């Protein structure tokens, strides 16, 4: 409890107003991102671990949400590392993954029903089923000759189905799991998909826009290759901070009702959200100078 009480804004409003360089804003943003990651750790510990911090046995429905929270933690720590190493291009890629994981987690928490979580699992097994069918076709074309790598792949696929409590015959080529756009619109609004998620697709797929902005330099009537990493600026961290705090808050409300520690964590989310808004506002003013 004391450790959670100690999660406080690093700088006061007056100190932020006196920032005279972007490095100072970056320091504040990085420390805030760390605190949001710590809050995710805290709710995971409250819900899925024993008093000693050892993970408890959980059922499949719990594992769907809990596993997504762990993915969110791992993505955030990798994001933080690349921020500190000054690798903006990698940050763009991880940022997109953070967004989709947060969307999935919030959707699963809001919908909450067993069928929704089952559709989430079933949808991920479609690709595995397609690979299984490709192997079967290839083996048939070779008159039943199975390659060692195909045997290993089939064992791996069967293992995934067994752990997920699905039979191969249950999974078809279509799924009732909503598209990422529909999930994003439901939990974050239409602008989120178009602006935050959609634009970040450039970095994931290596579209021309990503190549142009991050990997080339325009010179006169041609280009030069850009071998240097681009330096992250505070704005790249905004999305992760907002999403992390949103997920922590809704998780506490849905999964940790009447827990006094969870109530304190919700208060911390509000405090850090207000602090982030203050940072953002002052950084915007600073950029206009």
Give, region by region, the residue ranges found by the protein language model.
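Secondary-shell segments that build the walls of catalytic and ion/ligand-binding clefts
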Residues: 1-56, 122-289
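Long, hydrophobic/aromatic-enriched structural stretches that serve as scaffold segments
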Residues: 43-108
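Short, glycine/acidic-rich hinge or "gate" loops at secondary-structure transitions
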Residues: 91-93, 109-119, 258-266
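Short amphipathic alpha-helical surface patches that mediate protein-protein
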Residues: 96, 121-122
């Amino acid at each position: 409890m004391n450790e959670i009480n100690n999660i406080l804004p690093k700088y006061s409003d007056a100190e932020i107003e006196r920032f005279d360089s972007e490095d100072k804003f970056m320091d504040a943003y990085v420390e805030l991102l760390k605190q949001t990651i710590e809050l995710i750790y805290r709710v995971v510990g409250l819900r899925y671990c024993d008093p000693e911090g050892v993970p408890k046995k959980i059922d499949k429905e719990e594992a769907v949400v809990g596993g997504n929270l762990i993915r969110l933690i791992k993505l955030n720590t990798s994001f933080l590392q690349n921020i500190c190493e000054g690798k903006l291009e990698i940050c763009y890629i991880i940022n997109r993954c953070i967004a989709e994981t947060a969307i999935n987690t919030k959707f699963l928490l809001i919908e909450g029903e067993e069928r929704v979580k089952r559709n989430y699992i079933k949808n991920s097994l479609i690709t595995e089923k397609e690979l299984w069918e490709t192997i079967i076709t290839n083996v048939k074309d070779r008159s039943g000759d199975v390659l060692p790598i195909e045997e290993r792949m089939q064992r791996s696929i069967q293992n995934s189905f067994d752990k997920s409590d699905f039979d191969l015959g249950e999974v078809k080529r279509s799924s009732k799991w909503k598209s990422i756009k529909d999930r994003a619109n439901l939990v974050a609004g239409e602008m989120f998909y178009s602006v935050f998620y959609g634009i970040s697709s450039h970095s994931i797929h290596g579209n021309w826009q990503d190549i142009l902005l991050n990997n080339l330099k325009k010179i006169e009537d041609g280009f030069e290759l850009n071998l240097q990493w681009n330096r992250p600026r505070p704005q790249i961290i905004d999305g992760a901070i907002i999403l992390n705090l949103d997920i922590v808050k809704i998780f506490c409300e849905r999964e940790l009702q009447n827990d006094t520690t969870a109530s304190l964590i919700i208060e911390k989310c509000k405090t850090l959200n207000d602090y982030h808004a203050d940072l953002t506002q002052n950084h915007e003013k600073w950029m206009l100078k």
